[in-house]
C-alpha cells in the first residue's frame, strides 16, 4: 500500500496540470475568434471587448491581457484576423476568413465592370481629344492673325519715322531758297555785263 500511496500522489499533479490546460480554457486564438463571432460587429471588435468576453466566459489567469495581446498580433500576422482600426494590438479586429471570399467576389465583379466601362471611356476620350484638337487649331489661326496685326502696327509706327524724314526734305527747299538768290545775283551779273 505504501507503494500505491507514493505512486498515486505523483500521478495526481500530472492530471491536475493536464486538466488546467484542457478544461480551464481553450487556446487564446480560439477564444478571440469566438469573442469576435459572438459580437458580430461590422466595424470589428475592440481588444477591450474581446478581453471582457474571454474573462466572462472562460477561466483565465492573471496574465490573460498580455496573452490576448500577443495572440491578437499573431492572428493578424497569420491573416486570420483583419485590423480595421488602430495599430498593433489596439484597435478593432474582424475575422478575415469569413469576410474575404464575399469581398473578393464583390471586388472581382466590380473590377470587371470597371474594366468594361473603362474601355468605352478610353475609346471616347481620344474622340473628344480629336474634336478638341481641330477647335484649338482654328483658335490658333486667329491668334496668328492677331500677331500679324500686331506686326502691322509697328509698320505704322515706322511710317511716322518716314514723316520725320519729310521735315528733312523740307529743309532741302530751304537750301533751294538760297539757290534762288544766287540765280537772281547771276541775273544781276548778266544785266551788268549788258
UniProtKB/Swiss-Prot annotation:
Induction: Both the unedited and the RNA edited versions are induced by butyrate (at protein level). Only RNA edited version is induced by DTT, vinblastine or TNF (at protein level). SMART domains: H15. Residues 105-194 have a biased composition (Basic residues). The modification Deamidated asparagine is found at residue 4. The modification N-acetylthreonine is found at residue 2. Residues 24-97 form the H15 domain. Keywords: Acetylation, ADP-ribosylation, Chromosome, Citrullination, DNA-binding, Nucleus, Phosphoprotein. It is found in: Nucleus; Chromosome. The modification ADP-ribosylserine is found at residue 104. The modification Citrulline is found at residue 42. GO terms for molecular function: chromatin DNA binding; double-stranded DNA binding; minor groove of adenine-thymine-rich DNA binding; nucleosomal DNA binding; nucleosome binding; RNA binding; structural constituent of chromatin. Pfam families: Linker_histone (PF00538). Residues 1-29, 84-194 are annotated as: Disordered. ADP-ribosylated on Ser-104 in response to DNA damage. Residues 1-11 have a biased composition (Low complexity). One of its GO terms (biological process) is negative regulation of DNA recombination. The keyword Nucleus applies. Belongs to the histone H1/H5 family. Histones H1 are necessary for the condensation of nucleosome chains into higher-order structures. The histones H1.0 are found in cells that are in terminal stages of differentiation or that have low rates of cell division. This is Histone H1.0. The gene is H1-0.
Amino acid at each position: 500500500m505504501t507503494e500505491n500511496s507514493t505512486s498515486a500522489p505523483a500521478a495526481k499533479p500530472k492530471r491536475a496540470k493536464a486538466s488546467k490546460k484542457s478544461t480551464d480554457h481553450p487556446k487564446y486564438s480560439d477564444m478571440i475568434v469566438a469573442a469576435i463571432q459572438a459580437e458580430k460587429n461590422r466595424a470589428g471588435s475592440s481588444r477591450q471587448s474581446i478581453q471582457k468576453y474571454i474573462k466572462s466566459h472562460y477561466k483565465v489567469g492573471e496574465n490573460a491581457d498580455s496573452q490576448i495581446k500577443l495572440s491578437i498580433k499573431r492572428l493578424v500576422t497569420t491573416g486570420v484576423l483583419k485590423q480595421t482600426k488602430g495599430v498593433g494590438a489596439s484597435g478593432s479586429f474582424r475575422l478575415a476568413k469569413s469576410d474575404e471570399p464575399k469581398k473578393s467576389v464583390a471586388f472581382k465583379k466590380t473590377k470587371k465592370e470597371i474594366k468594361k466601362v473603362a474601355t468605352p471611356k478610353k475609346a471616347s476620350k481620344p474622340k473628344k481629344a480629336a474634336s478638341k484638337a481641330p477647335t484649338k487649331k482654328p483658335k490658333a489661326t486667329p491668334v496668328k492673325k492677331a500677331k500679324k496685326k500686331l506686326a502691322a502696327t509697328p509698320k505704322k509706327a515706322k511710317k511716322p519715322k518716314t514723316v520725320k524724314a519729310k521735315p528733312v526734305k523740307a529743309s532741302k527747299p530751304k537750301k533751294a531758297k538760297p539757290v534762288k538768290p544766287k540765280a537772281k545775283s547771276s541775273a544781276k551779273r548778266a544785266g551788268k555785263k549788258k
